């Protein structure tokens, strides 16, 4: 009680239930490992561990109110950021905190620095700076965010701190996708507690209403509360779970040592067949970047963490979740762009799908919703053979899909998309887009290379698809007539595109 007799606003972390306590029914189950896991069943890389779960707390509330050894403040490089977490900490800590911060002379992204807690219940504040997120620099952002969590925990260990209260380090204003950031946060904390956590008794994740659902969904993947939950969670783990410390792994930067140096590696020979929508990569800036998803998956297989069958099952479940969401989400804003639509059939009777590059304002739309819309439209189309016509006509840098988005789309979609795609007609390519496509199909998705046909004029396209079978955006017709001359006196009517 404070001097006025009012109850304290601060919350003692020892009074909060641990993550493990939230699933007592399953924890008390009499099922044994042998009963749940068959002899050839692959165990999760994040095993059920009662002791680790007892150290973790998920709490909805203000991190500044926690009574623990240290709380975490997320800020900017000058430690002057005005976000809800920082403002609450500064208000409760008092003016002495600002004076102390001036002595630190800032903090670089990924670093962690220590000050006293002053008027807070926590003895210390650990300040860190989360990365600004841009999808083209995703790998760097992942590494920086990992460093934030890792350096906070390392500092806590060096200072013999028994309890740490984490805010969500990836602040909304820095643009980091919450779910991606949560994966990094949880796996980093899990690995640290396993390897270095002997002196740390409590780690609290203090979250808001908006963040709680994501943490509730992902915590079972990294902190399963029972053998059953461990088994259920395995298919939902992402392909990249980091190294032994939870640090993001970049396959193309790893030195690979082959058992037989003179022999070709299987994992460089086997590539999935190309996915039609990857033609959207055409014109993307990062054409020389080689993505390593297949390598990541095979790395897990070699480590004995996932079998091929488990990977296929995991992929199918993941796709089904996207499909269910696509069917329930309101995607009218994406549909109104008229960037993807079905038209007629080609000369072989295969369905023709059109992608209009100029109608994709990449910087203005939610790309996750764009992915959902693609799945919503294409799921029933891809069950049989189809072709894609991509109009690159008059696109600008604001219409070029990021390679990371295309990589994500490639990872998500079902195998039928790749198997039944028979041709991609890339209309009105530029020199840059041709080079981009060559690099992408040579190094990343080799199965797509033979399916792409660059088409410089509509006249060339008509040798494969009759003009009556395609709905053309008016600006495509105008551009082609201006550049190549009018080959036809009339074209089929077009929708209002």
Swiss-Prot record:
Modified residues (Phosphoserine): 280
Ranges of compositional bias, category Basic and acidic residues: 253-263
InterPro entries: CRAL-TRIO_dom (IPR001251), CRAL-TRIO_dom_sf (IPR036865), Macro_dom (IPR002589), Macro_dom-like (IPR043472), Macro_GDAP2 (IPR035793)
Residue span, CRAL-TRIO domain: 333-481
UniProt KW Acetylation keyword: no
Pfam families (UniProt xref): CRAL_TRIO_2, Macro
Residue ranges of every copy of the Macro domain listed in the record: 43-223
GO biological process: response to retinoic acid
UniProt keyword annotation of Phosphoprotein present: yes
Keyword terms, alphabetized: Disease variant, Neurodegeneration, Phosphoprotein, Spinocerebellar ataxia
Gene Ontology CC terms, in alphabetical order: lysosomal membrane
PROSITE patterns noted in UniProt: MACRO
Region feature (Disordered): 252-273
Cross-referenced PANTHER family: GANGLIOSIDE INDUCED DIFFERENTIATION ASSOCIATED PROTEIN 2-RELATED, GANGLIOSIDE-INDUCED DIFFERENTIATION-ASSOCIATED PROTEIN 2
Family statement: Belongs to the GDAP2 family.
Recorded disease: Spinocerebellar ataxia, autosomal recessive, 27: A form of spinocerebellar ataxia, a clinically and genetically heterogeneous group of cerebellar disorders due to degeneration of the cerebellum with variable involvement of the brainstem and spinal cord. SCAR27 is a progressive disease characterized by gait difficulties, eye movement abnormalities, dysarthria, and difficulty writing. Some patients may lose independent ambulation. Additional features include spasticity of the lower limbs and cognitive impairment.
Protein's name according to its UniProt entry: Ganglioside-induced differentiation-associated protein 2
């Amino acid at each position: 009680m404070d001097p006025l007799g009012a109850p304290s606003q601060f919350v003692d972390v020892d009074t909060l239930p641990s993550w493990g306590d939230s699933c007592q029914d399953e924890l008390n189950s009499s099922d044994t490992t042998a009963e749940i896991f068959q002899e050839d069943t692959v165990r999760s890389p994040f095993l059920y561990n009662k002791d680790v779960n007892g150290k973790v707390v998920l709490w909805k509330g203000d991190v500044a109110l926690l009574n623990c050894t240290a709380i975490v403040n997320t800020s900017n490089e000058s430690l002057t950021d005005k976000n809800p977490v920082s403002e609450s900490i500064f208000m409760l800590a008092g003016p002495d905190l600002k004076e102390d911060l001036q002595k630190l002379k800032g903090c670089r992204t990924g670093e962690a620095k220590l000050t006293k807690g002053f008027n807070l219940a926590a003895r210390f504040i650990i300040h860190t700076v989360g990365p600004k997120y841009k999808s083209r620099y995703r790998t760097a952002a992942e590494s920086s965010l990992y460093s934030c969590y890792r350096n906070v925990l390392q500092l806590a260990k060096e200072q013999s701190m028994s309890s740490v209260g984490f805010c969500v380090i990836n602040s909304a204003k820095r643009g980091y996708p919450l779910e991606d950031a949560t994966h990094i946060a949880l796996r980093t904390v899990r690995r640290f507690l396993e390897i270095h956590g002997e002196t740390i008794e409590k780690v609290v994740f203090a979250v808001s209403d908006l963040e709680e659902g994501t943490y509730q969904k992902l915590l079972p993947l990294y902190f399963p509360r029972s053998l059953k939950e461990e088994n259920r969670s395995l298919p939902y783990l992402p392909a990249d779970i980091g190294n032994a410390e939870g640090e993001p792994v970049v396959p193309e930067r790893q030195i690979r040592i082959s058992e037989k140096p003179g022999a070709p590696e299987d994992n460089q020979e086997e590539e999935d067949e190309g996915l039609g929508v990857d033609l959207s990569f055409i014109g993307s800036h990062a054409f020389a970047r080689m993505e390593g998803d297949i390598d990541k998956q095979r790395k897990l297989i070699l480590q004995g963490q996932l079998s091929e069958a488990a990977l296929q099952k995991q992929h199918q479940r993941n796709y089904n979740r996207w499909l269910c969401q696509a069917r329930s989400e309101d995607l009218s804003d994406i549909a109104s762009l008229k960037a993807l639509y079905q038209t007629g059939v080609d000369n072989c009777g295969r369905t023709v799908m059109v992608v209009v590059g100029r109608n994709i304002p990449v910087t203005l739309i939610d790309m996750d919703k764009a992915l959902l819309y693609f799945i919503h439209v294409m799921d029933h189309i891809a069950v049989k053979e189809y072709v894609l016509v991509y109009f690159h006509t008059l696109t600008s840098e604001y219409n070029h899909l990021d390679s990371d988005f295309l990589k994500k789309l490639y990872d998500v979609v079902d195998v039928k998309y790749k198997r039944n795609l028979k041709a991609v007609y890339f209309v009105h390519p530029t020199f840059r887009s041709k080079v981009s496509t060559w690099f992408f199909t040579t190094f990343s998705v080799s199965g797509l290379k033979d399916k792409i046909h660059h088409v410089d004029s509509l006249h060339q396209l008509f040798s494969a698809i009759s003009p009556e079978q395609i709905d053309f955006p008016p600006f495509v017709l105008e551009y082609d007539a201006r550049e190549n001359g009018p080959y036809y006196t009339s074209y089929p009517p077009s929708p209002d595109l």
